[in-house]
Amino acid sequence: MSNNDSSWPSPANRIVNLRPNSPVRNLEMVILRIYPQRLVVSQQFTGHVAAACGRDETGIVGLVLWGSQVNDVRVGDIIRIESGWCRLRE
């Protein structure tokens, strides 16, 4: 499928533009909080994960830090999600 296909959602680069089941590209935000890490063991991934929340000038969003990101990212850091995926959590 081509990225120019109108059925493919365009990547979000601001929190206000995030849509479920859509790619996220070049989204910058400041990390507001990081929750305690936990160990995940599955067929797809084994390692530490931590929930976090961040904000830009348009809103606040939850995200998951994976593997080395858990220890590399700190509250107050400005991060860029270069290639991510938006999911709706209920």
Model-derived regions, located:
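OB-fold (S1/OB) nucleic-acid-binding surfaces
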Residues: 33-63
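Terminal helix-to-tail segments of small alpha-helical proteins
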Residues: 2-7, 13-19, 48-51, 55, ...
